[in-house]
Amino acid sequence: MASLKDLRDRIASVKATQKITKAMQMVAAARLHRVQEAAQSARPYAQRMAAILANVATDVDTIDVPPLMRGTGRNDVHLLVVCTAERGLCGAFNMQIARRARQQIKALLSAGKIVKILTVGKKGADILSRDYKALMIDHIDLRSVKRVGFAEAAIISQKIIDLFDKDTFDVCTLFYSEFVSVINQRPVAFGLIPMGSPKGAVEAEDVTQKVDENKNLQSIVYDYEPDVASLLEELVPRNLSVQIFQALLENVAGEMGAKVTAMDNASRNAGEMINKLTVAYNRQRQAQITTELIEIIAGAEAL
């Protein structure tokens, strides 16, 4: 049985931990409002750009479609871009994204495909490297970035374009977590390359409906200057950056939401533990007082 001093030390330790978790919860909650607003505000732009691009692609000959849109024409080598958080303490947020990526990896390997992995975020790299280190070809570290912006998305998209130009892969799929609410983040897979169809070209079943929500744009007739091929050459790489930027924003919002929930649960658990330890401390203290009183009374009677 723990002594009174041990119980006091444990209570003090748990209280100190509770202060930390409450502080982290407050910080995450303060950031959540800003990043949630950013993610939700950027969605219409990303959705409409993808829809317009898909519509424009129908007005150009196949031979004039940029390679990033039409792909290589093969389906043999798959590049999986897995975006997770750089830090932990956010519940199962990172594990859910990694689990979705694992499912896709297993399905592709079972189908005889070649899989290559590009990770964005330390936690995803740590998780996937346990089983698929040999498949990981590169990693993008964003730990030094205080606030994710379009510049980081452009770096990632340029890395993907460089790999594509080197004929490193045929199909590219982006994995991230779509922010639904503070307590709900949905891991999804989105087809980046080829991007000739609204849903991209992935074998995943839960591809986000970024374009399906804008089907009304497909009936619009466009005029192009100088010509549609030149327009696509400019729009396609930018659309790649835009979709990645949206994924990064969704990820940050999801991470903060998961962190708020995780720290709230941790604070509640700490409170319950403090109550249990306090009860144990009071019982042991009362038992010790009772024992001392009995010894005093017994000594007095002996005299």
Swiss-Prot record:
Q: What is this protein called?
A: ATP synthase gamma chain
Briefly, what is this protein's role?
Produces ATP from ADP in the presence of a proton gradient across the membrane. The gamma chain is believed to be important in regulating ATPase activity and the flow of protons through the CF(0) complex.
Q: What's this protein's family per the entry?
A: Belongs to the ATPase gamma chain family.
Q: Which gene encodes it?
A: atpG
Question: What GO annotations for molecular function exist for this entry?
Answer: ATP binding; proton-transporting ATP synthase activity, rotational mechanism
Assembly, in brief, is: F-type ATPases have 2 components, CF(1) - the catalytic core - and CF(0) - the membrane proton channel. CF(1) has five subunits: alpha(3), beta(3), gamma(1), delta(1), epsilon(1). CF(0) has three main subunits: a, b and c.
Can you name the source organism?
A: Bartonella quintana (strain Toulouse)
Which GO biological process categories is it annotated with? proton motive force-driven plasma membrane ATP synthesis
Membrane topology annotation:
Peripheral membrane protein
Q: Which Pfam families match?
A: ATP-synt
Keywords of the record, alphabetical order, are: ATP synthesis, Cell inner membrane, Cell membrane, CF(1), Hydrogen ion transport, Ion transport, Membrane, Transport
**InterPro entries assigned to the protein according to its UniProt record, in alphabetical order:** ATP_synth_F1_ATPase_gsu (IPR035968), ATP_synth_F1_gsu (IPR000131), ATP_synth_F1_gsu_CS (IPR023632)
> Which subcellular locations apply to this protein?
Cell inner membrane
Gene Ontology cellular-component terms for this entry are: plasma membrane; proton-transporting ATP synthase complex
